[in-house]
């Protein structure tokens, strides 16, 4: 099996952290908060999640400097499991495409 795609829209809720790996690859990490109403089994359901996002590579870094807390984005990429410093595993969305959502203001 090779399919691993996720598209999620939401609002950046934690300040982006920019780092460079020991191998020289720039990374930007932030958290995207999603809230929506979805249909399930014929009923409306309120959904909510916070998803850690990682953007890697030189070509993406110019875009990430425009991302701030409150930015509304649609992020597309693949998910992977990362082990945190506390030893717990968490899902992380590795962004391959990011679009800013026009707030209409």
From Swiss-Prot:
Keywords: DNA replication, DNA-binding, Primosome. It holds the Pfam family SSB_1. One of its GO terms (cellular component) is primosome complex. InterPro entries: NA-bd_OB-fold, Primosome_PriB/ssb, Prisomal_replication_PriB. It comes from the Bacteria. Involved in the restart of stalled replication forks, which reloads the replicative helicase on sites other than the origin of replication; the PriA-PriB pathway is the major replication restart pathway. During primosome assembly it facilitates complex formation between PriA and DnaT on DNA; stabilizes PriA on DNA. Stimulates the DNA unwinding activity of PriA helicase. This is Replication restart protein PriB. It comes from Yersinia pseudotuberculosis serotype O:1b (strain IP 31758). The gene is priB.
């Amino acid at each position: 099996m090779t399919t691993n795609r996720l598209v999620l829209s939401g609002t950046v809720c934690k300040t982006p952290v920019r780092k460079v790996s020991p191998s020289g690859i720039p990374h930007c990490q932030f958290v995207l908060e999603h809230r929506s109403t979805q249909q399930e089994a014929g009923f409306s359901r309120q959904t909510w999640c916070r998803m850690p996002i990682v953007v890697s590579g030189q070509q993406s870094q110019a875009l990430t400097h425009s991302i701030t807390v409150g930015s509304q984005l649609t992020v597309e990429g693949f998910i992977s499991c990362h082990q945190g410093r506390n030893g717990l595993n968490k899902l992380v969305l590795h962004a391959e495409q990011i679009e800013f959502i026009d707030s209409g203001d």
